[in-house]
Amino acid sequence: MEIKKEKDEELSKARHSLAHILAKALMQLYPETKLTIGPAIDDGFYYDIDLPHSITADEYDKIEKKMKEIINKGEPFTRKVVSRDEALKLFAGNEYKTEIINELPKDEEVSLYYTGDDFYDLCRGPHVDSAKRLQNYGFKIHSVNGAYWRGDEKNKMLQRVYCYAFKTKKDLADHIAMLEEAKKRDNRKLGKELKLFMISPEGPGFPFYLPNGMIVRNLLIDYWRELHRQAGYKEIMTPIMLNRHLWEVSGHWDHYKENMYLSVIDDETYAIKPMNCPGGVLVYKSEPHSYKELPLRLGELGIVHRYEKSGELGGLLRVRSFTQDDAHIFMMPSQIKDEIKGVVALIDKVYKVFNLDYFVELSTRPENSMGSDEDWELATKGLKDALDELNLDYIINEGDGAFYGPKIDFHLKDSLGRTWQCGTIQLDFQLPQRFELEYVGEDGQKHRPIMIHRVIYGAIDRFIGILIENFAGAFPLWLAPEQVRVLSLTERNNDYAETVSYTHLRAHETRRH
């Protein structure tokens, strides 16, 4: 059943208003500040500023004190609309604001928000009506980091002032306590302590698995293989690098090239695959198919590479090279619902093994997409109907689908209450059409199959990172790299301890130390 996506509009509006309060405080404390942008985000807000000196942690209290002074004055937030030319005059001397204004149509009016009478900023709103409404909110500056103007490394490096903001001071304290606990569980910290993986300066974002990490990884893979064998999947493996022409046909070249690693071989451009699906399509296309073979479920533990900015990398949770537990299902239109139900059941079974709760989102057509309106409507309806028949609650996530089709996303909840998007089911009418895939139907005629893309772990590497933090390194016994440690209390017990370890435990394939 579709449920309304819960968004706390009041909190979002307050965070946005607090960003303006921060900007006003910074201008009062550091008049040479040039303001750029300052949006609300999931746990608070930030403001990017151009300031000659670097703000240090010693200055946080001073800035917060100034913010509280402004709030306690109870100044109103008021909107004013001005012409483009007037806005350019108001922000003369601030090249960041004037750049934004100059991108607007010449006849477009510009929205400003005033905080009191002496501070204004470019903004569409909305905001609280008065700063008084922010008096009970808990907020705290937690960091100042570098950020390129508009995220472009060719532009000037700015300072991004991050703040947490919550409805009450208790909510703020609870959030900070959760983050402190999360630091103790950080996959980078525990990965090193437990000798699971390492990241080398010679390969940022490319994880090295150590012996203990390989045990966890291989156990997850073994479980995946057995589960999929029982569910009627066949495993394939496709090349890691393929010709540019393939990516042009698939649409990745137009929609995903900026995330791809390229190379030239024999004067031809090749790309290291960022996704496994075109390879799976080529496997299907390599021979004729009858309707009697469908659905054809092809699984692949494929290594993919995607470019991520260095500042966004984080242990196993954000990497540039990872293994996706992919599967591509080729089917007839009449099989859509049953196949989606089967995949949902498989995903549910896996998450229950790890005692992980989840919620479901149905992500719809993004702006940067390919295919006809009719195909997108059919695909979206197919996913929605399957979820409704399963009586699953789900949230509509507008505009967050893949460029080739809508998708069902599964968001895991960990022991700290954080959520992680892992599993996904994508229904695709586009790739079968672009690659001219066919099967011979019961009527003896050629028909176009429909394709499902799906993952359960998402990326095995990221899933391991989530498990490390969820279990704080104390994996379930079946997954633990070290299941038993034999200790000898005195020297005279050494021989017996070795007998227990090497004879009894090894005979039962127990992982011991």
Enumerate the predicted regions with their spans:
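A translation/RNA-centric and nucleic-acid-associated enzymatic feature enriched
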Residues: 267-269, 278-287, 296, 300, ...
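Metal-assisted phosphate- and nucleotidyl-transfer catalytic regions
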Residues: 74-116, 252, 352-421, 425
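Conserved small/polar residues in nucleotide/adenosyl-binding loops
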Residues: 503-510
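Glycine- and Gly-Pro-enriched alpha-helical subdomains that act as flexible
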Residues: 472-473, 478-481, 485-493
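Short, hydrophobic beta-strand segments
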Residues: 43-54, 158-163, 201-211, 323-333, ...
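Extended, charged alpha-beta segments that form solvent-exposed binding/catalytic grooves
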Residues: 304-386
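Auxiliary tRNA-acceptor-end handling modules of aminoacyl-tRNA synthetases
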Residues: 1-13, 25, 34-37, 46-308, ...
